Amino acid sequence: VGIKYALLDNLSLSTNIPFVYKSDQRSTSNERNATDIGDISFGGLWQPKKSDGRSLTMMYNSSIVIPSGASPFKIDPDTALSTGSGFYSTSAGFSASKSLDPVFVFGSGSIYYPLNASDLSQRRPNNRILTKVAPGKTLGLSLGMAYALSYTVSINTSVSFSYATKYKYYWENESSSTSGESTSAVLNIGSGWRISPQKTISTSLGIGLTNSASDFTFSFSIPFDFKL
């Protein structure tokens, strides 16, 4: 569930409360499910210059994420699934777009900076106790285009890339360990359906292109406007 409020003509604030369902089946007798809220986020979006149709339209954004979902570092990993990241984080980014009627091209970049997750006491295999996690930073980039099939229907496609630095794990009565760096790529295919001059239903299917990306993701959004 997302809420967006226009503070000024070129400045808006938003919050997002995700509801997450996850399922994992390792064997016919070992199935795990989780249904809970995810990590709540608060953000802002600023457009310094009004679009004139000739030059690039630039927007800048930032957000703060609260670890309200089930932390992967506080659950029993053998019996439960997480619905959140487990740590506070902040991000900043930009987006650029331009209309080349009937094609609309866009791109974006971002940096993600998470804070450490400490005061942990999670038992891992071989009776190791996890006490702290220093997550890696992530850089993201996406490029795409949209095409208007008619006044009411459009389709879009984009490719998203991300690069994450190493995680560092701290163990009770042991030296720390690190995970490897990772890269991820996702192909997104979506559509927009205009149901009124101010309202468009959006759908998107994400297909993972690398082992570190989810196999498939699906999103569906319907905006609702409220005037205060």
What spans do the regions from the language model cover?
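Residues on the lipid-exposed face of transmembrane beta-strands in outer-membrane beta-barrel proteins
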Residues: 1-5, 15, 42-46, 62, ...
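Residues that define the transmembrane beta-barrel architecture of outer-membrane proteins
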Residues: 1, 34-40, 56, 84-90, ...
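Detector for outer-membrane/organellar transmembrane beta-barrel domains
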Residues: 79-171
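Outer-membrane beta-barrel channels and translocator barrels
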Residues: 8-10, 20, 49-53, 100-103, ...
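Outer membrane beta-barrel transmembrane domains
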Residues: 128-228
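Outer-membrane beta-barrel translocator domains and adjoining extracellular loop/strand segments
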Residues: 24-31, 70-78, 112, 117-126, ...
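Transmembrane beta-strands of outer-membrane beta-barrel pores
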Residues: 17-23, 48, 64-70, 98-102, ...
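Transmembrane beta-strands of outer-membrane beta-barrel proteins
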Residues: 13-15, 42, 56-62, 90, ...
